[in-house]
């Protein structure tokens, strides 16, 4: 089978890359250890529901479902697997799962060994996870498997003339819970009909996060009462080159930056661009934070709570590979600004359509938009309301999934 030949080449390439790349090395090491983790931690007498997410973003999409199932069906145990270190390293101690490990690559040998050890009762693959051998083996063993929050586009291989064998992979799913009607139409065009439009579980997730947002006294002290606060989340250098110059020239606003990469060189680079008083979160005190105009979040795990302190938000990545999570900001009822690389994200298109999210092409667009928000309180309020309403109006995917899955 061509797919297995490609997988074999891919595995060889990954092992070679691991010699030079620490992140890939972590992944390879984790995959090798996965079988030992399963042997040690899996209870042969228990029924496991297996959730697989490529990385952290996909995990957050599946998380509401995991936690609802735990609450409603406590008799089941949860196995959570990851493909990427960026997911595993952050959530390896996640209390909502009984076992957390990497997913070994999709070779026939790995697949058989993994499923033998894990013996899942049911499986849930989040968003873009379509591993041919895992799905085929689950179907062969009559283990129910669901696709959650998936979204499909005409450009994907399943809908190309040369994608014949890949089309059959989608037929291994007992049901696909998709984000939009276009996905249903595309799937129907290749004979996949067990589908339901439920939307995106991330809407449910960000509403839950919002209701449990951490109170951060240092951020509260930094914000004060006199000036509007601009929160830039998951920013990269091209993003920072747009909003930092504006901040430098506008003393009527404060700035919180939570960069995507928080290594020392990037933090120093950011500080070098700033022309106003700045403090790092890990070095902040009740005294010095009040004197700063910019607060740099140099640790992980706070961003989803920090957006609550802003009047305007910026979500980074849109001048690189793709934007990060816009819903984390929108849920707090504040306008969201982002760069042009957002076309693959349905929620970004929805935010733009409702005038709660705003795409910029560069610094001129950003400056014009910020001038409008800072000078027109009614415009700022309406944009924020639009963003918050968009999130609330699109929640409910979790309930639709729970009504369909039989446990």
Where are these regions (language model features)?
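A short alpha->beta transition loop at the rim of the catalytic pocket in nucleotide-sugar-dependent
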Residues: 142, 311, 333
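Active-site and donor-binding regions of nucleotide-sugar-utilizing enzymes
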Residues: 15, 19-212, 216-217, 231, ...
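Acidic donor-binding loop of glycosyltransferase active sites
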Residues: 118-122, 290-321
């Amino acid at each position: 089978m061509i797919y297995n030949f490609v997988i074999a080449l891919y595995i060889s390439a990954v092992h070679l890359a691991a010699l030079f790349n620490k992140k890939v090395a972590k992944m390879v090491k984790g995959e090798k250890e996965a079988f030992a983790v399963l042997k040690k931690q899996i209870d042969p007498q228990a029924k496991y529901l297996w959730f697989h997410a490529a990385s952290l973003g996909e995990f957050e999409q599946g998380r509401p479902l995991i936690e609802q199932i735990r609450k409603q069906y406590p008799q089941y145990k949860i196995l959570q697997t990851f493909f990427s270190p960026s997911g595993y390293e952050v959530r390896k101690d996640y209390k909502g799962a009984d076992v957390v490990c990497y997913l070994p690559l999709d070779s026939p040998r790995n697949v058989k060994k993994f499923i033998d050890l894990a013996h899942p009762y049911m499986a849930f693959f989040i968003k873009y996870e379509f591993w041919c051998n895992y799905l085929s083996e689950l179907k062969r063993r009559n283990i129910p498997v669901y696709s959650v929050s998936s979204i499909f586009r005409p450009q994907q291989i399943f809908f190309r003339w040369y994608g014949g064998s890949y089309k059959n992979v989608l037929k291994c799913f007992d049901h696909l819970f998709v984000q939009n009607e276009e996905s249903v139409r595309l799937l129907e065009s290749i004979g996949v009909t067990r589908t339901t439009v439920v939307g995106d579980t991330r809407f449910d997730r960000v509403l839950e996060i919002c209701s449990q947002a951490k109170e951060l006294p240092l951020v509260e002290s930094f914000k004060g009462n006199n000036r509007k606060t601009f929160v830039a989340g998951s920013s990269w250098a091209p993003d920072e080159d747009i909003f930092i110059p504006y901040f430098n020239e506008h003393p009527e606003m404060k700035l919180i930056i939570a960069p995507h990469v928080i290594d020392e060189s990037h933090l120093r680079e950011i500080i070098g661009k700033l022309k106003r008083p700045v403090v790092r979160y890990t070095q902040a005190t009740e005294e010095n934070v009040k004197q700063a105009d910019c607060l740099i979040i140099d640790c992980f795990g706070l961003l989803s709570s920090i957006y609550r302190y802003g009047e305007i938000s910026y979500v980074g990545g849109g001048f690189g590979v793709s934007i990060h999570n816009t819903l984390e900001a929108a849920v707090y009822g504040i306008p969201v600004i982002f760069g042009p690389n957002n076309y693959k994200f349905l929620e970004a298109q929805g935010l733009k359509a409702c005038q709660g999210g705003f795409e910029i092409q560069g610094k001129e667009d950003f400056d014009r938009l910020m001038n409008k928000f800072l000078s027109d309180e009614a415009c700022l309020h309406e944009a924020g309301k639009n963003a918050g309403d968009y999130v609330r109006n699109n929640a409910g995917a979790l309930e639709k999934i729970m009504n369909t899955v039989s446990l």
